[in-house]
Amino acid sequence: MTTLERPQPKLSMADKAARIDAICEKARILPVITIAREEDILPLADALAAGGIRTLEVTLRSQHGLKAIQVLREQRPELCVGAGTVLDRSMFAAVEAAGAQFVVTPGITEDILEAGVDSEIPLLPGISTPSEIMMGYALGYRRFKLFPAEISGGVAAIKAFGGPFGDIRFCPTGGVNPANVRNYMALPNVMCVGTGWMLDSSWIKNGDWARIEACSAEAIALLDAN
C-alpha cells in the first residue's frame, strides 16, 4: 500500500510520541508481564497496582495475553494496559481490538512500523542499532524501546545515541535491574524502563501477591530516591 492509498490516522506521529511520553513518564517502570494462567490476571495486576505500578505491558508470549488485555481493560479501567511482543500486523490488529492502549515490539520490520503509522494506538518499536533507529525515524518515529538493553550496550549505548539522534527517547528493556535502573533513569533521553524483577515466576505460581506488591513498592521507592 502506498502512502497515498494508506488511510491517514487522526493522530500524527508527533501526537503519538507525545502520548508515549505521557504513558512512560507517568509509569517510569513498565513491568513486562507474561500470563501463564488465566486466573493470575487480576490478582497479579492488583498486586502491581497496590505497589504503585499501574502501567502494564502484557506480552503475547502466552495463549492468555490477548485475554489478559481484554480483562484488564474491562475490569481494571484505572490501569494503563499495553501489549508487548507484537511481531506482525495481524498481532497488532488483534491487540488493537482487545483494547490495548499502546503497543511494544521486540524489533522492527517495515510492516510493523507501517502498522504503527496507520494505527491510532501509539507504537514503541524495539531497536538495537543506529540503522534500525533510522528506519523508524524515516517514518516519523521518535520513541523507541532499546532491546535487549544491556547486551546492546546499555547506558553507554543510549548516551552515544544521543549524539546523532538528539530528539530520540528510549525505554531500555532487557537486563534492567535494581542495581542499574537508576543509572538508566538518570539519562535525559530515557523516559522509562521495561523490566520484570518484581515478576518472579515462583511468586506468581505460588500466588505470593504480597511479595510482588512489596517488590513493586521497593522499585518505585528506588526511583523516587533518584
Curated annotation (Swiss-Prot):
Keyword Lyase: yes
Enzyme class, broadest EC rank: lyase
Keywords of this entry: Carbohydrate metabolism, Lyase, Schiff base
Gene3D superfamilies: Aldolase class I
Site (Plays a major role in determining the stereoselectivity): T173
Amino-acid positions noted as binding pyruvate in the UniProt annotation, renumbered to this chain: R61, T85, K145
Stated name of the protein: 2-dehydro-3-deoxy-phosphogluconate aldolase
This protein's encoding gene: eda
